[in-house]
Amino acid sequence: MTEQTVTLQTTVGDITLELYYNHAPKACKNFYELSKRGYYDNTIFHRLIKDFMIQGGDPLGNGRGGESIYGKKFEDEITKELKHTGAGILSMANSGVNSNGSQFFITFGPTPWLDGKHTIFGRVKSGMKVVQKMNAMQTNNDKPIDEIRIIKATAN
């Protein structure tokens, strides 16, 4: 399979994400297809915790919404090879075991306590300066004060 990426055009700048199909095929297919369908277009990053992560992918914008392409929550794809070792890791947000939908997060630094709990399915290929800029933004109750929006998600 040729490398597939997704570019998030955000109000802060562009981030291109490389997807790890060999390690997490279901999560990658879900993210890629949702991006292709315009599912993430005009959604916000609803959660930002400095030096931890930024979370998006919820069409409701409050952390409670989102569906997968599979019509329901899908199972985790945890591998021992992939760990949350630094900034720029792309991982599925969930509410417990096997509860993946459409929400995802990008790490701002090492988050080893998430290993074995969240499916890693990619990394930032380009746009780390944009991710760093997001990390520096002010928040109120873990929500960015100045809204960070995905204008368009493009499946490449």
From Swiss-Prot:
The keyword Isomerase applies. GO terms for biological process: mRNA splicing, via spliceosome; protein folding. InterPro entries: Cyclophilin-like_dom_sf, Cyclophilin-type_PPIase, Cyclophilin-type_PPIase_CS, Cyclophilin-type_PPIase_dom, Cyclophilin_A-like. The keyword Nucleus applies. Its main location: cytoplasm. Its EC number is 5.2.1.8. Residues 2-155 form the PPIase cyclophilin-type domain. It catalyses: [protein]-peptidylproline (omega=180) = [protein]-peptidylproline (omega=0). One of its GO terms (cellular component) is catalytic step 2 spliceosome. Pfam families: Pro_isomerase (PF00160). It is found in: Cytoplasm; Nucleus. Keywords: Cytoplasm, Isomerase, Nucleus, Rotamase. Interacts with snwA. Belongs to the cyclophilin-type PPIase family. Catalyzes the cis-trans isomerization of proline imidic peptide bonds in oligopeptides. Plays a role in protein folding, transport and assembly. PANTHER family: PEPTIDYL-PROLYL CIS-TRANS ISOMERASE-RELATED (PTHR45625), PEPTIDYLPROLYL ISOMERASE DOMAIN AND WD REPEAT-CONTAINING PROTEIN 1 (PTHR45625:SF4). This is Peptidyl-prolyl cis-trans isomerase cypE.
